[in-house]
């Protein structure tokens, strides 16, 4: 999930470097015209792949495999249709187009943003998937990992360099699949009740890809009875929604949710808000022609006639208020794919026997602050004033009432240093990260564990030596992915030897989980053990260059505030407008008193005092 985006290269893998990788082993090797390892028969027809070199050996890659009919023209906004068979042999040797999306131009040329931007042409004809498999093909069925990218449901692509599957496939001998799915209005615009734009078609794209995996992955050496679905940010929220949707649940067997959860406050909207956003976008692009009026069919027909870029150019204007970590078109609680809110489905679900791995990074909120929080920029230390902190809380928790915002301020202020710019910067980062990622993930882990699931939890704490974001941002959202996918194994990317070893360890944890539902290595019982997360002990591990360290209570105090106290406070004061006004007045008096006391104490501390007492 990432705020606004700009294309076309991944700065960490610059064009000269990509050419070098291609020439000396990062690209395809010369193969005989019909290498049997690179010819596969799937239900749609025959495929020809290519052999790629990873640092320790070759893998087979089948890139740009169509799994759906192009969702263009009259198919815009509709559920995907399976790809019809093709004649002859289809070349699956290059990534295909990226789904049409907003492109980030806030920091042009900066590698920290460019690495997430589209690296292929934008098109609505984008429903393709990719398969990496060991070379030669496994002789016995091999566990399968299926990746869902993040990007706030408005951006992302399976072709990004950071999602290169060759390293994990070669190192661990697993089959890896990734797919494109529609994002933004193309994937999530919803007019609930309308057959023309039902919503959630991006999730249906993902489900169709999972069905394709069940039908075809055995041809690549994969085991369709051992499929692990994993994703990050909006990809993790998507994984969670498939867990909560019965037609999806039978298509995979284990789940990994990295820095995201379906119960996050940004991850879904209700039917009323979904319709409001859809009709507002329509008005912004001049639909229906002639102004107000018209039915859903006419409105959708008009929207289908608009150029794709028109929809992208206006989609951010449908949000109800200024915010960070909120996205225009997201999954809708439609009564179909999601029969109820994620929170209700999690509370009511039966998760006995489910195996889940969940986690967060150390500084989940920092990335989003440079996309709209007052006083923040990647180009300075972002040392904010108290006024900017207070304003930042309102954009960081945009749906909060005045009472809720005051409670957030009270909880996150260091009252011994209420005006300290660095502490205020860290506090706002924690507000955004805890509210949107850490505490929804912790809540999900606890509920799943309490209902019989076997859960493992982590916090990723290593800041990559190659990271281009400023130091104050710490370990930002999304920057564990390069280690999970094994990019440090590529020597030309200039990671340290320690980071290479660390990446190998993480790939082993993820692959072990895909194989057995347990990240621990049964071949190394003397290694530090990763214990399951339970609702009582709440054990999780820290992932960094040091050996595993077991801890308890992932941001427990902060998450008690978000998951327990704040909902009860708001419920208890729902109709108490006068009480809220009185509480605010008392709070402001107390807050002013604390600031005054601190100033007086600092003044006193600087005075000369009797040295002979």
UniProtKB/Swiss-Prot annotation:
Entry GO terms, CC: extracellular space; plasma membrane; side of membrane; synapse
Disulfide bridges in this chain: 99-126, 287-302, 439-559
Signal sequence interval, chain numbering: 1-30
Keyword Hydrolase: yes
Domain of life, per lineage: Eukaryota
Sorted UniProt keywords: Cell membrane, Disulfide bond, Glycoprotein, GPI-anchor, Hydrolase, Lipoprotein, Membrane, Neurotransmitter degradation, Secreted, Serine esterase, Signal, Synapse
Oligomeric and partner information: Interacts with PRIMA1. The interaction with PRIMA1 is required to anchor it to the basal lamina of cells and organize into tetramers. Isoform H generates GPI-anchored dimers; disulfide linked. Isoform T generates multiple structures, ranging from monomers and dimers to collagen-tailed and hydrophobic-tailed forms, in which catalytic tetramers are associated with anchoring proteins that attach them to the basal lamina or to cell membranes.
Name of the protein in question: Acetylcholinesterase
């Amino acid at each position: 999930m990432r705020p606004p985006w700009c294309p076309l290269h991944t700065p960490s893998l610059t064009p000269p470097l990509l050419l070098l990788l291609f020439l000396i082993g990062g690209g395809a090797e010369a193969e005989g015209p019909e290498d049997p390892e690179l010819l596969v028969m799937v239900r749609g027809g025959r495929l020809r792949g290519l052999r790629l070199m990873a640092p320790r050996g070759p893998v087979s890659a089948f890139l740009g495999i169509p799994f759906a009919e192009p969702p263009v023209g009259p198919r815009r906004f509709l559920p995907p249709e399976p790809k019809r068979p093709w004649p002859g042999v289809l070349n699956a040797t290059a990534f295909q187009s990226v789904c049409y999306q907003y492109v980030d131009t806030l920091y042009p040329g900066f590698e920290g943003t460019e690495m997430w931007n589209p690296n292929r042409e934008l098109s609505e004809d984008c429903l393709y998937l990719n398969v990496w498999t060991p070379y030669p093909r496994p002789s016995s069925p091999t566990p399968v990992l299926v990746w869902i990218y993040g990007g706030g449901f408005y951006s992302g692509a399976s072709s990004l360099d950071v999602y290169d599957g060759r390293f994990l496939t070669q190192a661990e001998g697993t089959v890896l699949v990734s797919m494109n799915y529609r994002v933004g209005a193309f994937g999530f615009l919803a007019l609930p009740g309308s057959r023309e734009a039902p919503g959630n078609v991006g999730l249906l794209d993902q489900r169709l890809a999972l069905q394709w995996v069940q039908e075809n992955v055995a041809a690549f050496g994969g085991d369709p009875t051992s499929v692990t679905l994993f994703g990050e940010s909006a990809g993790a929220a998507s994984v969670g929604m498939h867990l909560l949707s019965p037609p999806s649940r039978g298509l995979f067997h284990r789940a990994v949710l990295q820095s995201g959860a379906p119960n996050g406050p940004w991850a879904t909207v209700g039917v009323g808000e979904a319709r409001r956003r859809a009709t507002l976008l329509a008005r912004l692009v001049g639909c229906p022609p002639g102004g107000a009026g018209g039915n859903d069919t006419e409105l959708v027909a008009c929207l289908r006639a608009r150029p794709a870029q028109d929809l992208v150019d206006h989609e951010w204007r449908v949000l109800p208020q200024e915010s960070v970590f909120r996205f225009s078109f997201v999954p809708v609680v439609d009564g179909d794919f999601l029969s109820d809110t994620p929170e209700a489905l999690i509370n009511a679900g039966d998760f006995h026997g489910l195996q889940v791995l969940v986690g967060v990074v150390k500084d989940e909120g920092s990335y989003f602050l440079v996309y709209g929080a007052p006083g923040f920029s990647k180009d300075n230390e972002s040392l904010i004033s108290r006024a900017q902190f207070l304003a930042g809380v309102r954009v960081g928790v945009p749906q909060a009432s005045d009472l809720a915002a005051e409670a957030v301020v009270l909880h996150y202020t260091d009252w011994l240093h209420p005006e300290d710019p660095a502490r205020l910067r860290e506090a706002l980062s924690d507000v955004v990260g805890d509210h949107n990622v850490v505490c929804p993930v912790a809540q999900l882990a606890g509920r799943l564990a309490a209902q019989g699931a076997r859960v493992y939890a982590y916090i990723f704490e290593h800041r990559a030596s190659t990271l281009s974001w400023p130091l104050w941002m710490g370990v930002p959202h999304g920057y564990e992915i390069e280690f999970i996918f094994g990019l440090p194994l590529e020597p030309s990317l200039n990671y340290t030897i320690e980071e290479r070893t660390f990446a190998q360890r993480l790939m082993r944890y993820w692959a072990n989980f895909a194989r057995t539902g347990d990240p621990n290595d049964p071949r190394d019982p003397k290694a530090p053990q990763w214990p399951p997360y339970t609702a009582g002990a709440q054990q999780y591990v820290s992932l960094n260059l040091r050996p595993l360290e077991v801890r308890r209570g992932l941001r427990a105090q902060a998450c008690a505030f978000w998951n327990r106290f704040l909902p009860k406070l708001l419920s208890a004061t729902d109709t108490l407008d006068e009480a809220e006004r009185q509480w605010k007045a008392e709070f402001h008096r107390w807050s002013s008193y604390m600031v005054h006391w601190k100033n007086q104490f600092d003044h006193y501390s600087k005075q000369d005092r009797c040295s002979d007492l």
